[in-house]
Amino acid sequence: DVIPHRENVLLEDIEIFKDFLVVSERENGLNQIHIKRWDGSDSYYLPFDSETYTAYTTTNIDFDTTVLRYGYQSLTTPSSVIDFDMVTKTKTIKKEQEVLGGKFKKENYTSERLWATATDGTQIPISLIRRIDTEKSPETPLLLYSYGSYGNTIDPYFSTVRMSLLD
């Protein structure tokens, strides 16, 4: 099988290159980008810097290239366009969303992925962001928004509005 069936994985998109097959997947509510050499010599998932993120392939029109262009953002990282060399496994950030005001510093925030158990035993992913100087306690204020049913989820994305609320 080129792409074997996995019960807990949703295939969202594919990109076909001369030497590579790139499969966009969703597992446990999170995007993944799986890169496979056609000759079977290498198969790996793109590594990402955060537990909570959104990643997706963008337009890749050159069949002969070894460079994959994709989009990435997380709760703490502005939207970025990245070129990834599938041979050397190196990435180059081509563009990152500018955050106006000059006060945003990524290192002031942290994010994590938690799991809640529903009454039927289903595991529900939770993406959490906070300032690093905010204490985690039951008394800490929390803004919760959610949606996840019928195969649809809210991807963890960067929001300047949310950052101002955290500040």
Report the location of each language-model feature.
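C-terminal, active-site-flanking charged/polar segments
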Residues: D1-I3, D39-D42, R162-D167
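Surface loop/turn motifs at the tips and blade-to-blade linkers of beta-strand repeat domains
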Residues: V2-E7, P47-E51
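Beta-sheet repeat architectures centered on beta-propellers
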Residues: R6-V9, D19
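Serine-hydrolase catalytic core recognition
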Residues: P47-F48, T52-D167
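Beta-strand C-termini and the immediately following turn/loop, strongest in propeller blades
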Residues: V22-G29, K36-R37, R69-L75
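Short loop/turn segments that connect beta-strands within beta-propeller blades
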Residues: R37-S41, M86-V87
